[in-house]
Amino acid sequence: NVSVCLIETGPKDNSEAIHTPALFAFILNDENPKYVYPYETVPQNEFSSVTVTEGTANLADSAGGTYQVPQEYQTNRRGYQPRGKTLGGSSSVNAMLYIRGHKWDYDHWASLGNEGWSYDDVLPYFKKAEGNEQFKNHFHNDSGPLNVAKIRNNNPFVSMFIEAGTQHYKYTDDFNGEDQEGIGRYQVTQKNGRRWSTAAAYLNPARVRPNLTILTDTTVDKVIFENKTAKAVKCLINGIPEEIRCAKEVLLCGGAYGSPTLLQRSGVGNRAFLESKEIECIHELNGVGENLQDHIDYITSHRVDSWSLMGSQSLKFILRAPFEVLRYILTRTGMFSSPIAEGGAFLKTSEDLEAPDIQLHFAIGMIEDHGRKKTPGNGFSCHVCLLRPKSIGTVRIASKDPFKDPEIDPQFLSNREDMSTMVKGYKVMMKILNTQPLNQFSNVLDPVNINDDKAIESAIRARSDTIYHPIGTCKMGNDEMAVVDTNLSVHGLSGIRVVDASIMPTLVGGNTNAPTIMIAEKAADIIREQNKL
């Protein structure tokens, strides 16, 4: 008895590149991207553009080599921030890893005053969404719409990564169970070897409903308020302004960059800032666009001459690819079913920590500069990611033009503790890569002296960037910088909620796709209850 209009800026999700798992790398790095916003950050004060001389490093000799700073030293490198621009949003272009975060994260949200958002409160919504092919127990459900599956590619290098890692840390077969800590293989949001985005899981089954209207290729300019109540959205369809009225409420689901900037264009935010952009302030809410948090990540790549590894400029992979394509078409298994980052770990850089503070991703290809740097040959890479950064940034509109990219400033590494933890995390990662059987692969593209903290810091400043998990810019809470309450309604306004990763008050310890889906499931129940549906 309720009609719903879904408005998406991007096109339909009907590309084979979306649904074939391993092809997401081509979507992210397309020179003329159709399915992502190719955002960049503003220049980051703690980033540099230092490059190192590529060479062979012997892992047995502390990663070998010395980090060399060239004479042409450029500071303030920009980061890359691609976001999904199609039905399903970033769940249609991500690496599909199913990670919820740590129990501590949600209990921390509740401790900040967000009643109803503790781990025990949100676990039922993780389970409600989940259709897990491997597990059904206190932590998992096997009948939800979001299919969760094992990776359908048995890569020997991932097995070697786990063998090396478990000589130092415990093994786990479930990062989302009783204890997150350990090393193992990721699960993915796939079904029968195909990407299982939120569009596949939720939207496609609902398309036949007569009360659902889906608009694609439609840009939302702003929300229209009457007496501080959301009454309509102003859209641009093929450049022509249209106004879509709503009888009940507007739900903003634009993510950590889309939702706060839409609020700002609508006149909701810091008054002085809005007036500087010639926007009338409808409602002053200083937290809009503040509290940006993101996982910073460092990657090391190793060239290995192997048929089992991927490479964009690799003769072996070029020769193998046609057979892998046929294998995927016939069986939905093999390299093209892979999320590329197949193995991983959640580890502590200090034994006294309550929860892991770093995450590793072991990838079956050399993923340099988000895959934008084409590296000849085959190889593997390993990421180390800082799970709970102390650095906090902002996102703001550049102008009131909805087609202008936002000004994204994560302020990566601005808090000294983040660099300290990243250095420790780098050493943890290299300890694993320096252990049999991985230590036989010693051709490191950018060798760093593992015993020189300053060299490691320089490498991190030169090569680290996001791993695509921005959150917090419309944070939930009851303090003066909170944007939404625990029902996800915008403070001081009526008829408008935010339902996406931007409402997270703090960053969770893991990938953010599954937590965002949990938020949406919980929001659906809140909306049903408050509207007596």
What residues fall within each predicted segment?
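N-terminal redox-cofactor-binding region of secreted/periplasmic oxidoreductases
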Residues: N1-L533
